[in-house]
UniProtKB/Swiss-Prot annotation:
EC id: 2.7.2.1
Keyword Hydrolase: no
Pathway: Metabolic intermediate biosynthesis; acetyl-CoA biosynthesis; acetyl-CoA from acetate: step 1/2
This protein's UniProt keywords: ATP-binding, Cytoplasm, Kinase, Magnesium, Metal-binding, Nucleotide-binding, Transferase
Localization: Cytoplasm
BP terms from Gene Ontology: acetate metabolic process; acetyl-CoA biosynthetic process
Designated name of the protein: Acetate kinase 2
Taxonomic source organism: Vibrio vulnificus (strain YJ016)
Transmembrane spans: none
Cofactor note: Mg(2+). Can also accept Mn(2+).
MF (Gene Ontology): acetate kinase activity; ATP binding; magnesium ion binding
Cofactor(s) essential for the protein: Mg(2+); Mn(2+)
UniProt keyword Nucleotide-binding present: yes
NCBIfam families: ackA (TIGR00016), PRK12440.1 (NF009099)
Length: 397
């Protein structure tokens, strides 16, 4: 199995992220991105053996299908085809139907499409990617790995909304959670770092990127998470508002805002972008803070405070506590944001290891703080969702 490769596909509404992953080591032998699908400047780029290549994707439509078709030729040209044993697809929403990775057939694809109402930006695109890959690689078994699956272990007290029960029974409204593949991976890596069995370790995993979520993981299982029915709830994010009084929506509608305008604002013009009035990028926020920008400073303060609040509240969900895991683009790389979050958790007794915090960036894992009070640590673990997708696909062969 030393050369057991999996083609991992993450199909977005106007993009296609792909990688050929060694399912044993997690190494990305080939990685690339197709973007601007549906536009005149649709293109596809990839990296192989340190060299980058980019090509234009011609044609007015079917860009997902064209890009995956080009993948067939590319993997053959690079001599990878003979070692690819499966195709793994990242699918955002599995609802209650899919609680684990499944082998894809027509019935599974149709069910993913039926869940489009729960993830209108993601599931239809995922299904397009599946259908294109099934046609392009008909001899390869294909698997769907769901962002929501890891959270299906949440108890009812955690996933049930305090709303009329028929809203759950008739419409499936409940907490589902996302970033599950990331939370799953980093919790296993954290247990290894502490030399503890995953079944006997409990963490609060903090995935901070343009999208962000916190997950309470008790003995290896998700028991609560900050994202809910959709990825809009929970933490403040790059452009998403996070938790918000739902009465505000009614108020804005009464003020003459359209439903589309309200939800565009909450999804695409809030978070770092909305509070700062400047940018959705955490790096831009930090740069502007250094120059005294008030909006950026406030955005930094709101973000770090809300993350700390969630971490503290999730101690109530755990039977024991081994530590905090920071991951995602911001969590893995932003020393000032991690430092401020831990500062806001001063009553938990975390003392920063300044050198450890400096070193744990740019792909490096490490312990960044310790709490003698809780006998716990804060650590950084770079996530690798593609590796999980590859592993779980191979396990079902």
């Amino acid at each position: 199995m030393s050369n057991s490769f999996v083609l991992v596909i993450n199909s977005g509404s106007s993009s296609l992220k792909f990688a050929v992953i060694n399912s044993v080591t997690g190494e990305a032998v080939l990685s690339g991105l197709g973007e601007c699908f549906g536009l005149e400047d649709a293109r596809m780029g990839w990296k192989y053996s340190g060299e980058k290549t980019e090509i234009a994707i011609e044609g007015e439509d079917n860009h997902h299908k064209i890009a995956i078709g080009k993948l067939v030729g590319l993997t053959e040209e690079l001599g990878l085809t003979k070692d690819i044993v499966a195709v793994g697809h990242r699918i955002v929403h599995g609802g209650e139907k899919f609680t684990s990775t499944v082998r894809i057939n027509e019935e599974v694809t149709a069910e993913i499409e039926k869940l489009a109402d729960l993830a209108p930006l993601h599931n239809p695109a995922g299904a397009i990617g599946i259908r294109a890959a099934m046609e392009a690689f008909p001899a390869l078994p294909q698997f769907a790995v769901f962002d929501t699956a890891f959270h299906q272990t949440m108890p009812k007290r955690a996933f049930t909304g305090a709303i009329a029960n028929e809203l759950y029974t008739d419409f499936g409204i409940r907490r589902y959670g996302f970033h599950g593949t990331s939370h799953y991976f980093v919790s296993r890596e954290a247990a290894k770092m502490l030399n503890k069995p995953i079944e006997e370790s409990s963490f609060i995993s903090v995935h901070l990127g343009n999208g962000a979520s916190v997950c309470a993981i008790n003995n290896g299982e998700s028991v609560d998470t900050s994202m809910g029915f959709t990825p809009l709830s929970g933490l403040m994010m790059g452009t998403r508002c996070g938790d918000l009084d739902p009465g505000i929506i009614e108020y804005l509608l009464k003020k003459g805002w359209s439903q589309e305008k309200v939800f565009n604002s909450l999804n695409k013009a809030s978070g770092f972008l909305g509070v700062s009035g400047l940018t959705s990028d955490a790096r831009g926020i930090l740069e502007a803070m250094e120059q005294g920008h008030e909006g950026a400073t406030l955005a930094f303060q709101v973000f770090t405070y809300r993350v700390a609040k969630y971490i503290a509240s999730y101690l109530a969900a755990l039977d024991s506590f081994d530590g905090i895991i920071f991951t995602g683009g911001i969590g893995e790389n932003s020393l000032p944001i991690r430092r401020e979050i831990l500062k806001n958790l001063k009553l938990l007794g975390f003392v920063e290891d300044e050198k450890g915090n400096e070193d744990a960036r740019f792909g490096n894992a490490g312990v960044i703080a310790t709490s003698a009070l809780l006998n716990a640590v804060a650590m950084v673990i770079p996530t690798n969702e593609e590796f999980v997708i590859a592993q779980q696909s191979v396990e079902l062969l």
